């Protein structure tokens, strides 16, 4: 089981680095759009994967762990979200920090619900 989680985490982490970087460069600086997009797509995927796991009894516990704990856990990042929020506050950008927290929370919940209902 641990190897499945480790492999999923590795793929998720590399995916986060690539997707977050591309989105951040395309979106410009000043707002952590790369991390926001990664966390929203990761929330959607987690909802989708969990719904798929419920609807697909042949999905083994190992592959479920690979997709959810491994890939989604490695792909999404609460620590980076927290750091970027603190950085915005320390820079005096309180409204951006508040918007980032609000958008992250509300949209991540919506993305998870959408993913769950899509599967």
Where are these regions (language model features)?
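Membrane-interface helix-loop junctions in multi-pass transporters/channels
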Residues: 1-119
């Amino acid at each position: 089981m641990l190897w499945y989680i480790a492999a999923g985490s590795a793929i998720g982490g590399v995916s986060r680095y690539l997707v977050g970087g591309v989105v951040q460069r395309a979106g410009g600086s000043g707002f952590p759009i790369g991390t926001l997009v990664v966390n929203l797509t990761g929330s959607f995927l987690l909802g989708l994967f969990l719904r798929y796991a419920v609807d697909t009894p042949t999905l083994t516990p190992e592959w479920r762990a690979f997709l959810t704990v491994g890939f989604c856990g490695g792909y999404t990042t609460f620590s980076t979200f927290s750091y970027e929020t603190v950085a915005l506050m320390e820079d005096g950008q309180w409204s951006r920090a508040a918007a980032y927290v609000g958008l992250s929370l509300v949209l991540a919940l919506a993305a998870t619900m959408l993913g769950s209902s899509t599967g």
